[in-house]
C-alpha cells in the first residue's frame, strides 16, 4: 500500500535560500506540499494560518531560534499544532545534546550538510 504524500504538508523553517530551495525541491519531488518560514517570527504565524503535518526546523534561524520556536509550538493551546513532529536541522549538532533537543520538544534531528536520502526517510517516518 503506498502512502499518499500529496495530502501531506511540510513547513520548512530555514533562513538559507540555498538550503530552503534544495529541501523544498527534494520534498516536492516526493509530492509533499511545502509551506515556508524564513525566520522564527514566521513559524507560529504559518502554523496558525496553514495546517501542516510536520515541521523541519533550522535551529539557527533569525528572530527566534529554532529551539525557542519549538518550545512555543509545544506550549501552543491547539493540539493540531503542539503535537506536530518537529525535525531539527542544524550544522551545530555538537552544540546540543539529545537531552536538550528533547527538552525543547524536538522529535528528531538531521545534521547539516543535509543528506537528502535521510531527509526523505525521516520525513516519511513521521508523516508517511
Question: PLM features: residue spans?
Answer:
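Active-site beta3 strand of CheY-like receiver
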Residues: 51-56, 61
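Acidic catalytic/metal-coordinating carboxylates
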Residues: 39, 65-72
Amino acid at each position: 500500500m503506498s502512502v499518499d504524500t500529496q495530502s501531506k504538508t511540510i513547513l520548512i523553517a530555514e533562513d538559507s535560500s540555498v538550503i530552503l530551495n534544495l529541501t523544498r525541491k527534494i520534498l516536492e519531488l516526493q509530492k509533499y506540499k511545502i509551506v515556508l518560514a524564513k525566520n522564527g517570527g514566521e513559524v507560529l504565524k504559518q502554523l496558525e494560518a496553514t495546517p501542516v503535518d510536520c515541521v523541519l526546523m533550522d535551529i539557527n534561524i533569525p528572530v527566534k531560534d529554532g529551539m525557542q520556536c519549538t518550545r512555543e509550538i509545544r506550549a501552543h493551546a491547539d493540539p493540531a499544532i503542539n503535537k506536530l513532529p518537529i525535525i531539527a536541522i542544524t550544522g551545530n549538532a555538537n552544540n546540543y545534546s539529545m537531552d536538550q533537543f528533547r527538552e525543547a520538544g524536538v522529535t528528531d534531528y538531521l545534521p547539516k550538510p543535509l543528506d537528502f536520502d535521510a531527509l526523505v526517510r525521516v520525513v516519511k517516518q513521521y508523516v508517511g
